[in-house]
């Protein structure tokens, strides 16, 4: 074996190793560029509210209008919107609901309640349950407010669920407290959202987009 042949032979392992490293790097970049699309199903999603007064506790519901989210696990960045039909709110009492829509929510003027998340704090496991905190903008009564809410997320290959509980200090946020002289109502309302839908893996075209 001449000198040139010997040198070329010695370079082969390094070339193979270099190719392996390039493939590994490419796979890491591809994984980090992958995003997950969450579609919310109105039939499987529930929005409940609880409001207390001096006599009893009022329980009611709202309906999901639409919802779609895009999540990047590598960065925790999330985008999209969850939209609730404000006009769908009901508590089982027609008189109370009419007052809620006319005086508190003003749902004819502000027909939607929306949450636009922008960041997830904590890791979301690709399978099973995870406890995270979701940051974003919550819009109610025509005003955006920044909130951070704890969420319990459960992932499966083709579907997902998330349970969120948070408090809306509606009176502090400028909405009317429906209290009367003889019936005092709490200044805040408890919200329980259980969202569910489908999952789809996607690959981002460019991190700059």
Q: Which residues does each predicted region cover?
A:
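Intrinsically disordered, low-complexity regulatory segments enriched
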Residues: 6, 19-20, 165, 178
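Bacterial N-terminal signal peptides
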Residues: 15-28
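Low-complexity, acidic/polar, glycine-enriched regions of mature
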Residues: 31-209
């Amino acid at each position: 074996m001449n000198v040139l042949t010997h040198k070329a032979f010695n370079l082969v392992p390094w070339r193979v190793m270099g190719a392996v490293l390039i493939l590994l790097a490419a796979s890491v970049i591809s994984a980090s560029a992958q995003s997950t699309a969450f579609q919310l199903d109105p039939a499987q999603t529930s929005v409940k509210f609880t409001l207390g007064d001096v006599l009893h506790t009022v329980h009611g519901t709202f309906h999901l209008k639409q919802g779609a989210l895009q999540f990047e696990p590598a960065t925790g960045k999330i985008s999209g919107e969850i939209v609730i039909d404000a006009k769908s709110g009901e508590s089982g009492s027609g008189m109370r609901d009419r007052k809620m829509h006319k005086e508190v929510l003003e749902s004819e003027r502000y027909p939607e309640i929306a949450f636009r998340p922008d960041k997830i704090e904590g890791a979301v496991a690709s399978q099973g349950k995870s406890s995270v905190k979701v940051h974003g903008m919550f819009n109610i009564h025509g005003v955006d407010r920044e909130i951070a809410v704890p969420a319990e997320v459960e992932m499966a290959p083709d579907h997902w669920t998330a349970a969120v509980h948070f408090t809306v200090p509606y009176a502090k946020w400028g909405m009317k407290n429906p209290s009367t002289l003889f019936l005092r109502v709490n200044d805040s309302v408890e919200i329980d959202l259980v969202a569910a839908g489908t999952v789809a893996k996607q690959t981002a075209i460019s991190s700059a987009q």
